[in-house]
Amino acid sequence: MKRVIYVFALLIICETCFSQNKLQDGVYLVDRSAANSIAPGKTNKAIVKFNPFFFEGDPDTYKPLVVFTDDFVPFKLAAAPVIQHQNGSEGQVLVHLTDSAAQKLGEFTAKNRMSEVVVVIDNQAIAVYKVFDPVSSALIKITRCTGSACSLISRQLKNSLKI
């Protein structure tokens, strides 16, 4: 009887884990509308939590974000991510997108001026930016980081994108 209960519990856990949609790594538009809850019938939105390695200040201020999933820019890298170290322990992660991904990012940012976008890596938000001008370069900074966070993101990009 115990085995049946354990098997049943394991099945429920597996069902829960695999039923959650995993977002592709990329740039997504943030939904800041007043009613940004996800309705049961809506499939073009998802909730993204922040990666705790990228908290600056009070972690309670980092609420989950609602993002649109129907129009986004997937990360298609032309080369391995680069960690550029700056003052002290702070650095930034730079990625070189393929030509098609860079073109899509330019169109995406032109269409979504004055809106917020979020960089999602491994189904977690690592940075939120407000779009003022369209991005015109294939080499972009995706986040600032300190400590081991830069290495973590670089490793996740290399592993998930198989570059």
Locate each region found by the language model.
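Structural signature of multi-pass, alpha-helical inner-membrane proteins
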Residues: 18-163
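Bacterial Sec-dependent N-terminal signal peptides
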Residues: 1-22
